[in-house]
Amino acid sequence: VPTVTGGTNPVTVADEVPASGIRFVTDESLPAEGYELNVDGEGIEVRASQFPGFLYALQSLEQLLPAAVYGTEPAPDAAWEVPCVKIADAPRFAYRGMHLDVARHFFSVDEVKRYIDVMAIHKLNTLHWHLTDDQGWRIEIKRYPELTAVGSIRKATVVRKEWGTYDGTPYGGFYTQDE
């Protein structure tokens, strides 16, 4: 938010709702991933029983802002206002996930992080990350270095739906233990 608004982070934590601030209240009566978001002339109040509920409430709050909030450049002309609203929400399904198959098509660490950010925007809670298969081994195991030395790179990629037509370009990558 500070990047696109050109200011500092507007979130503060306090017992009382500060001017133009957000108050977070633990409410054990709400389901684990549920939340209540109340925006009125007094400020913003978020109620949840656990961390996931608070996270999903903040995602909803962010979605109430102009689309420029998802940008990477300052947008000083955007109307950085949140409309008055009352939202009570909880997921219908416990498992809400997406599959990322890096065994067949490698994604950089930054791309994986962006993928997870987009999952969070949509309040998905499970990443099914396919790290190994015949097409690639994508995780470093220091005891078995040949897994990545050999298994992380393929000699060529099929360029058509016809078997036997390859581009001749080596392709691949893997994630280090530090990453």
Go through each PLM region and give its residues.
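Conserved, mostly hydrophobic/aromatic
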Residues: 50, 98, 119
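Acidic/histidine-rich, surface-exposed loop or edge segments in extracytoplasmic proteins
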Residues: 40, 100-101, 166
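Boundary/entry segment of secreted carbohydrate-active catalytic domains
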Residues: 93-103
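Contiguous, structured surface segment used for ligand recognition
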Residues: 1-95
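Second-shell loop/turn segments in exported
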Residues: 45-48, 101-105, 169-171
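A conserved hydrophobic secondary-structure block that centers on an alpha-helix together
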Residues: 101-134, 141, 176-178
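Aromatic- and acidic-residue-enriched carbohydrate-binding clefts of CAZyme catalytic domains
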Residues: 91, 135-179
